[in-house]
Amino acid sequence: MPNWTYNRIRVRSDDSEKIKEIKAIFERKDPFNALIPEPDWTTIPLTEETLHRYSFSEPRGKVGECSMMVKNENPFLAGLRFPSTNKSDDRWYEWRCDNWGTKWEACEIEITQDDEDFLEITFNTAWSPPEPVAEILRSKYECNNVEDYHKGLYLSINWFYELEGEEGCGYLE
């Protein structure tokens, strides 16, 4: 069970098409994957380097083996598994943390303000804000910094979280 991070993205632009594009990304169930696509783990064989990662005893599969999607009513037995060992393929976890900044997709996405020149989106992420996703948004849409917020496209990202007995926040400009 993660600690949740509440994220807010605000976009201001005189280009309504860019506003619509960003809105469309966050109307999907997988906005992070839309911006930074996750590999298809069923097509990527295990390597010597990834064979024992996160495993303290037996390897998760065989070198060169690809995982398969297993369906099961029990959620602990469903998902990507290696046929030779029936162990879970958890390579997604490190990849997502490295490439999205968090282990899961955005959840509880809400478009809280939607005008022709302003968009505000809120969502939650597990443990931490999706900083790499924010950087891709800024780069893809050529966002201005805070001093130039009234020209072109300006995007601000804020996040808030609570840990036992303390609160934290941050922002990217």
Predicted features along the sequence, with ranges:
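Long, contiguous binding/interaction regions
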Residues: M1-E173
